Amino acid sequence: MRFYLKRFTQVISIFLVIALANFTFQYIFPNSYQRFFEPIPNKVERPTELEPNEFNVEVSLMRLGIPTGAVDGVWDQRSRQGFCIWRELTGRDLNRDVPDLAEQRAIVETQRLTLDRDFIVGVNINKACQSAVWVKDATMQNFEIIYVSTGVEPGGTDVGTWSITWKVNRWYESVQIPDGWMYKPMFFAYKGQALHGSENDSFVHWYPASHGCVRMLHKDIEKLWSAGFGLGDKVRVYGKWQG
């Protein structure tokens, strides 16, 4: 019994010595103590710059929030739409051409997009690119880029800056076009033109295909409704389709 009591006393003594040493070190050298017990951070490697090729160009556009269709390294009409949007939002001449090597490098090096002074808070519809930039507040930094399909030319969707005058939160059949069903339309122009979803998202083509309205994907018109976009909010239509 005396043996175990002696061993217990020795263990307690060792514990007290360690605790006292730890407390003393912490009190005398607080900065060193904190650094000693801080976790060692993982080494973060600098991101490797992307090489300018078909796949990485699409990846770069996607990271910038520019839709390009499938990110697969195969450039199609949706990719050309993305190139057009990128050119607009980086201050270049608008076209849907495939980028040359210099432009490919510029795309993968682009860090941010910039809206010019003509953009307004609201939905800005570019007929040349068949795209819309939804600017959500006056900072002009909070925006989203989406596909649209405007009216068939000549004529098509009226150019100008308009306000939403009325909207219908359900499927609605056009008065002017029999069996012309619109999903949750928001009307803005005096000729009954509207932002709306179509019977099928596949009807939102990369080219002008409507009777004058602005077709959107269902998810995008839903976002507008969910955000409270509506009466009095602005719709700006500009540009010219050159297919």
Residue ranges and their predicted role:
Residues 45-56, 62-106:
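Short acidic, glycine/serine/threonine-rich helix-capping segments at coil-helix boundaries
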Residues 62-67, 84-92, 112, 137, ...:
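Sec-exported extracytoplasmic/periplasmic mature domains
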Residues 23, 27-32, 156-159, 171-243:
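Exported/periplasmic cell-wall-interacting domains
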Residues 40, 105-114:
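Non-catalytic propeptide/linker segments at domain boundaries
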Residues 113-204:
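Gly/Pro-biased beta-strand-loop elements
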Residues 46-53, 71-78, 123-124, 154-156, ...:
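Extracytoplasmic/periplasmic, Sec-exported soluble proteins
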Residues 54, 58, 80, 84, ...:
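Extracytoplasmic/secreted envelope proteins and their assembly/folding machinery
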Residues 3-8, 15-70:
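Acidic, Ser/Thr/Pro/Gly-enriched interdomain connector segments
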